C-alpha cells in the first residue's frame, strides 16, 4: 500500500493543536522535527535536572504526517492551511512515500564504524573487519549512540587511548548513557566498576540489553544511581545541559581522576571553560567535523 506524506511548517505554539487536528483528519502518524536541523539555526531540545521542561517543538517546526491516500493528505492540507484555521501553518509538500523493505534499508545505512584501526563498532548483521581486535556489537535503536556521530567516536577514541597507554579506567560513570556505548567501550578497555545513567528509562533498558549482548557487566539506572567518586566521568550530552551539570559532574570525579565531556561545538568551547572554571581547567582533547572533546584532570 502506498502512503502519502504531508509536510507542513508551523510555529511552536501551534504544534500540539496541529497534531491533534491531523489525528482528527485521519493521519496515520505525526512527527515533529526541527525545520532548521543541520543549519547554524538548529535548536536542541532536552530535559535535565535543574532545567525548565523542554518545549513541545522548535520555534520553526517541520510537521510530517502520513496518510493512507493522496486524497486524504490533500484534504487535510486544504483544511489546515485555510486562513481561518492555522495562521502560521505553511504547506511544504505532499508526496508519495516509496514502498521499502525497511529492515533491508535500515541495515544498509549502518555499516561497521572505525574508531581506531583495531577498534570497531559493528552491527550484528555484519561480519567484523579482519583487523578488528576489539569491537562493540551494536544495532541502531531508540537511544542515542551508535558510533556514527563525531561526539561518540571522539569519546571512544579517548577510551581506547587510555587502554593503549595502559591507563586503567577503574571506576567509571557514563552520565547520559543513551545506548550505553561509552560504558560498554570502557568495559572493553578494562573498567571493572561502571555506572551508566540516563534520565530516559528507554535508554537505561537499551544500555542493559546492549551490555548483555556484548558480554560486559555494568550498572544501568536513573541519575540517582550515580553515587560517590569515580576515576573517570564521561558525559556526551550537549553544551547547555553540560553547563548546568558542571557542579554535579565535577563532584563525582575523584582526586587524580578524569572528566571527559562531549556534545560541544567548537564555538562553545569558551562557554564550557567558563562554566567549569570554578571546579577544573577544561582543555580541548580532540576535534572532528566542528565538534570538540573537552576534558580535565582533577
UniProtKB/Swiss-Prot annotation:
Any single Gene Ontology cellular-component annotation: cytosol
Keyword Glycoprotein: no
Localization of this protein: Cytoplasm
Keyword Ribosomal protein: no
E.C. designation(s): 2.1.1.-
GO MF annotations in UniProt: protein-lysine N-methyltransferase activity
Binding site residues for S-adenosyl-L-methionine: 152, 176, 198, 236
Matches recorded under NCBIfam families: prmA
Protein function: Methylates ribosomal protein L11.
Name used for this protein in its record: Ribosomal protein L11 methyltransferase
Source organism of the structure: Polaromonas sp. (strain JS666 / ATCC BAA-500)
Amino acid at each position: 500500500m502506498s502512503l502519502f506524506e504531508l509536510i507542513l511548517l508551523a510555529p511552536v505554539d501551534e504544534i500540539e493543536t496541529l497534531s491533534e487536528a491531523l489525528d482528527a483528519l485521519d493521519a496515520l502518524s505525526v512527527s515533529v522535527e526541527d525545520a532548521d536541523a543541520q543549519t547554524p539555526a538548529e535548536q536542541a531540545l532536552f530535559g535535565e535536572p535543574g532545567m525548565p521542561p523542554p518545549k513541545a517543538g522548535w520555534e520553526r517546526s517541520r510537521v510530517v504526517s502520513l496518510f493512507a491516500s493522496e486524497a486524504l493528505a490533500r484534504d487535510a492540507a486544504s483544511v489546515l492551511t485555510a486562513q481561518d484555521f492555522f495562521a502560521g501553518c505553511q504547506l511544504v509538500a505532499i508526496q508519495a512515500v516509496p514502498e521499502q523493505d525497511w529492515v533491508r534499508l535500515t541495515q544498509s545505512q549502518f555499516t561497521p564504524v572505525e574508531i581506531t584501526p583495531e577498534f570497531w563498532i559493528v552491527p550484528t548483521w555484519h561480519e567484523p573487519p579482519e583487523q578488528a581486535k576489539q569491537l562493540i556489537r551494536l544495532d541502531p535503536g531508540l537511544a542515542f549512540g551508535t558510533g556514527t556521530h563525531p561526539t561518540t567516536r571522539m569519546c571512544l577514541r579517548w577510551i581506547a587511548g587510555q587502554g593503549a597507554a595502559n591507563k586503567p579506567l577503574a571506576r567509571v560513570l557514563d552520565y547520559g548513557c543513551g545506548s550505553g556505548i561509552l560504558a560498554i567501550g570502557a568495559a572493553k578497555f578494562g573498567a571493572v566498576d561502571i555506572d551508566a545513567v540516563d534520565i530516559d528509562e528507554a535508554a537505561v533498558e537499551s544500555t542493559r540489553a546492549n551490555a548483555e549482548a556484548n558480554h560486559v557487566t555494568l550498572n544501568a539506572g536513573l541519575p540517582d544511581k550515580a553515587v560517590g567518586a569515580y576515576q573517570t566521568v564521561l558525559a556526551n550530552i550537549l553544551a547547555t545541559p553540560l553547563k548546568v551539570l558542571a557542579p554535579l559532574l565535577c563532584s563525582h570525579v575523584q582526586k587524580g581522576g578524569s572528566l571527559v565531556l562531549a556534545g560541544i561545538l567548537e564555538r562553545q568551547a569558551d562557554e564550557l571553560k567558563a562554566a567549569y572554571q570554578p571546579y577544573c581547567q577544561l582543555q580541548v582533547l580532540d576535534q572532528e567535523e566542528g565538534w570538540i572533546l573537552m576534558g580535565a584532570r582533577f
